[in-house]
Structures are given as structure tokens and as C-alpha cells.
Amino acid sequence: MSKRIPRFLRNIQLPAGPQGPKGDPGPKGDTGAKGADGFGTEAQYNDIISRLEALEQSSGGGTT
């Protein structure tokens, strides 16, 4: 014989219990492949700056 939970008790949430002890740390992961340093060339930098300035001027912003 199974008993049904009354409707008014179905959505009641009880407070959380105390936190358990911290577990042991896991093993250290493998080091990934070393990539490029992430810095572009001076030509790439100048291209980005000129594009940014063009966008600022076309939108009415910027100080140049």
C-alpha cells in the first residue's frame, strides 16, 4: 500500500544540510601544445587601427 504525498507538501523545500568534507585533489592534467605568442605583426596592427578609425569616423564618433 503506497501513500500519496499531500499536494501542499509536494513543493516544500527543506534547508540544505551541512557541507561535507573537501575531497582529495585530482591528478594534474596534461599540458597542451604550445601555441604562437598571439601578437600580430606591425602591419596587422596598423591595419586594425586604420579599420577602427574608419569605423569611428563613419559612425560619427572618434576624436580624429
From Swiss-Prot:
Transmembrane stretches in the record are none
Entry keyword annotation includes Mitochondrion: no
- The annotated regions of Low complexity compositional bias extend over 15-40
Compartment annotation: Virion
**Looking at the record, which segments are called Disordered?**
1-40
GO cellular component term of the entry, any: viral capsid, decoration
Question: The organism sits in which domain of life?
Answer: Viruses
Q: Can the keyword Cell membrane be found in this entry's annotation?
A: no
Name the UniProt key words of this record, in alphabetical order.
Capsid decoration protein, Capsid protein, Virion
Q: Where mainly located?
A: virion
Functional description taken from the UniProt entry:
Decoration protein that binds to each capsid protein hexamer after capsid expansion and forms spikes at the surface of the capsid. Each of the 60 hexamers has three copies of the decoration protein gp12 in its center.
Query: What does the annotation say about its assembly with partners?
Result: Interacts with the capsid protein gp13.
Q: What is this protein's record name?
A: Decoration protein gp12
